[in-house]
Amino acid sequence: ARNLCMILDARTGQPYYDLSEILKDKNYYILTTNQDKQFTRLFPEEKISAIQGDWRYFQCSSRCHDGLYDSVETLHKLNDAIDSDLRVPTDMIPRCPKCGAEMEPWVRSWVFLEGRKYREEHSKLNAFLQKNIHKKILFLELGVGRMTPMFIQEPFWNLTYAYPDAFYITINPKDALLPEKLKNKGLAIREDIAKVLADTKKFSGGKM
């Protein structure tokens, strides 16, 4: 609970504000594997797909039903109740209202619930892609590493290759990779993301 409260209460980083300014008045969509509140504080929920879950929700650990529950208030109550031995009263442990199993944060794990909310996140993204398939589209990849390239990086590569007027930009100080097949449709920027976004906002007036 303490760790999750630190994550959920963390101040929004400046790069998120800069990105928000850059994208203002543009036709955009955000695909993220981040599970915190950084994006949802600044961008409308309908323009975000959090495909790896969200710390703001609980699910049943046994996945007995397709339901998600707000976790924020409960997490703060648990955090306040932690004693000097780092324990909380047993009766405060959140339990499933259906089967009584312990509740689990709705984030990627062995028991991650890929139910209605999960499908909605993918449906929103797919609807945006289909609507814009024949338009000029920029796939901007920010900070994707080599641990889970299958969620954002590889789909962006495939979509850039397939879409006629697509272009791909990856910004990463270490893992900015550009496939050979995208050498004429992409750009790898091996720089600090915060600096690139700040410079983009400063020198282009938010235009990108």
What is each of the regions a protein language model found here?
Residues 1-208:
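Conserved catalytic alpha/beta core of Sir2/sirtuin-type deacylases, generalized to analogous enzyme cores
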